Regions:
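Bacterial N-terminal signal peptides
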Residues: 9-20
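Short beta-strand elements in bilobed, periplasmic/extracellular small-molecule ligand-binding domains
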Residues: 56
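Short acidic/histidine-rich motifs immediately flanking catalytic phosphotransfer sites
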Residues: 74-76
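Bacterial N-terminal signal peptides that target proteins for export
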Residues: 1-11
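Exported/periplasmic ABC-transporter solute-binding proteins
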Residues: 24-51, 59-60, 64, 68-72, ...
């Protein structure tokens, strides 16, 4: 009886360990993504999940909000920033969880949505305008640079509504709460492009927060990101390739 009991316990222990290892292997890839790129990355991830069987979980907010979450220990495997500096800051900070160099994944384009399509609308104070919060969102920061141009000084008394991120800014405009919005092209493909020389380039960088040696799914995902197929999906979404 004692032998049978010991054997039964050994089998239970072996089964428990196997199940534990199985659950470890089945953990989803956890990704933090800037709001402007969320929908594009969701489409990319849908194909990755279908072809590999690996699950991906997205958390989306403005770049500044996500940076604060990561700095305070939020458990992400990779971070897609809407700018270059934030990703580089994580990659170079010895106290951060970054596990590799930051890399460019897309170049953003700022557009003016609404009205008659003329950029001169920005000079009219009667036109209310939505932008993302420039303190936490790179597209909002770029928008403020554009609004600071001399030819738009007459519009400085306009109603300016700041969304927590570009998605909320888009919603302000789309629902009619504002007349105009300065947005990423990916959210309003038919809107009027802002000349690139009017603001610093919106270079969107990502950085891995887990080591690929410990996370084989992340290694496979990073390879997938560099494929021509994914690059084509990013371009189709309204972004430009990295220079």
């Amino acid at each position: 009886m004692l032998i049978h009991a010991l054997m039964r316990n050994a089998v239970l222990l072996f089964t428990t360990v196997c199940l534990a290892h199985s659950s470890w292997g089945d953990e989803p890839l956890r990704i933090a993504v800037a709001a402007n790129f969320r929908n594009t990355l969701a489409d990319i991830n849908e194909v990755f999940e279908r072809e590999t069987g690996h699950d991906v979980v997205l958390s989306s907010a403005s770049t500044g909000v996500l940076y604060n979450q990561i700095s305070h220990g939020a458990p992400f495997d990779i971070f897609f920033s809407a700018d270059k500096d934030t990703a580089l800051l994580l990659a170079s900070d010895s106290t951060s969880p970054a596990a590799g160099d930051a890399f460019c994944y897309a170049m953003g384009t700022l557009v003016l949505a609404g009205g008659d399509g003329s950029l001169n609308q920005l000079a009219d104070p009667a036109n209310s305008l939505a932008i993302a919060n420039p303190s936490t969102a790179p597209y909002g920061e770029a928008a403020m640079v554009v609004l600071g141009r001399e030819e738009f000084a007459s519009g400085q008394n306009r109603k300016l509504v700041r969304g927590t991120n570009v998605i909320q800014s888009y919603q302000f405009w789309f629902t009619g709460s504002t007349d105009l919005a300065l947005l990423p092209k990916a959210l309003a493909k038919d809107a009027t492009p802002i000349p690139k020389q009017w603001h610093p380039p919106v270079e969107q960088f990502a950085v891995a927060l887990s080591t690929t040696s410990d996370n084989k799914v992340l290694a496979r995902y990073l390879d997938w990101l560099g494929s021509d197929r994914v690059k084509a999906m990013i371009t189709e979404a309204g972004y430009e390739p990295c220079s």
